[in-house]
A protein has these predicted regions:
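Catalytic machinery of carbohydrate-active enzymes
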Residues: 1-360
């Protein structure tokens, strides 16, 4: 039996019970991978009782992932990135103050009963406080990314030692509500039109239903999380030798040059993905037999969709931040650098995932 999370405030659980409509706000702003990792929290709350109205406060850039999500009743987008750009412009500070005030009025008028801060930052703490919820749950100070975040919460949780992965750490914040999560589930709805467009694209590339489509995403949000292009090329050449394998190179903003460098140096022909939005990317990932990527949003999107996924890790810990799921694994660099992660290690892990998929 795993240890129970510690409620640092010392209060007894505010159990989710009673006939009244309970209004809960989840505050998890970014990034894409982190928001995906928090999806099981929404699903656990939705299944905890009837009569819940669930709202998620999220950055505008990640809004598309949550819009129309079956576990949510509403989504409130905020654009703190825009606020940071505006603040340095003439009259920009006044604009930001106006936007913040309107947001505060909007969330305060919802009259939330509970707010759950999964981010642990000052900005997420402020938004949690803006809700005016009498129960405001967050991490204990020693587990917050910014310790002053705990000033804005009144139910503070220290995840148990058994909650190694960030998904399990997020779920531990439900303890003050007396919610015991069941099996972890990710719900990622995709638009049928996006799936049709991507099926048409793959058909144009000659991809057949029996082909083993292997997606490789070479981009990363930070330079120190970026596996060298030469390593990706070596990996792709080896995986292209798998039965019926087709290599699909994915890319995001400012990353197409890396995908082209990999493609142009390969012995086998690879498919360069078209520009995609979030739903189109998801449609491609749902179609693939394996996803290989750095610790980045597309990797975690693939895992959430049930696609076998291999994450490549250097400075971040695979056991905490790796792709979460049955047919998912992370390979850790022995020296903490991405360059120190040899292609052979990634090839062996990828082949093991492909073999497990073939064996069912």
């Amino acid at each position: 039996m795993s240890a129970r999370p510690t409620v640092a405030s010392g209060r007894r659980p505010d159990r989710i019970s009673g006939p009244a409509l309970l209004k809960i706000a989840i505050v998890k702003l970014s990034s894409l991978g982190d928001v995906i990792h928090a999806l099981p929290v929404a699903h656990a709350l939705r299944g905890s009782r009837s009569g819940i109205h669930l709202t998620w406060i999220v950055e505008a850039r990640e809004y598309a992932l949550l819009a129309g999500h079956p576990d949510l009743d509403s989504v409130v987008p905020v654009d703190t990135r825009l606020w940071r750009r505006l603040i340095w412009r003439p009259a920009g500070a006044r604009q930001v103050v106006g936007k913040v005030r309107r947001l505060r009025r909007r969330v305060r008028s919802a009259r939330f009963d509970v707010a759950i801060d999964l981010q642990g930052l000052m900005k997420s703490g402020l938004l949690t406080a803006y809700t005016g919820a009498p129960i405001r749950i967050g991490f204990s100070a020693d587990r917050c990314r910014e310790r002053l975040n705990c000033l804005f919460t009144n139910r503070r949780v220290r995840p148990p030692a058994s909650a190694v992965h960030v998904v399990d750490q997020y779920l531990s914040l439900l303890a003050p509500l007396g919610v015991t999560p069941g099996p972890v589930e990710f719900h990622v709805p995709l638009l049928p039109a996006a799936e049709r467009r991507m099926e048409d694209f793959l058909g144009e590339q000659g991809v057949k239903s029996q082909d083993c489509l292997i997606a490789i995403n070479p981009g990363a949000g930070r330079a120190d999380k970026q596996w060298p292009v030469a390593h990706f090329r070596a990996l792709a050449d080896r995986l292209a030798q798998e039965p019926n394998a087709r290599i699909l190179l994915l890319w995001g903003p400012d990353e197409v040059h890396m995908a082209r460098q990999i493609r142009d140096g390969l012995q086998a022909r690879a498919i360069l993905a078209p520009p995609t939005d979030l739903h189109e990317l998801g449609a491609l990932l749902r179609r693939t037999a394996l996803m290989v990527a750095n610790d980045t949003g597309p990797l975690h999107l693939a895992a959430a969709l049930g696609t076998p996924s291999l994450g490549l890790y250097g400075p971040t810990r695979a056991e905490r931040n790796g792709p979460y799921g049955r047919h998912c694994t992370g390979v850790q660099s022995p020296d903490g650098t991405m360059a120190g992660l040899a292609p052979d290690l990634a090839v062996d892990a990828a082949r093991a995932l492909l073999a497990a998929r073939r064996d069912g």
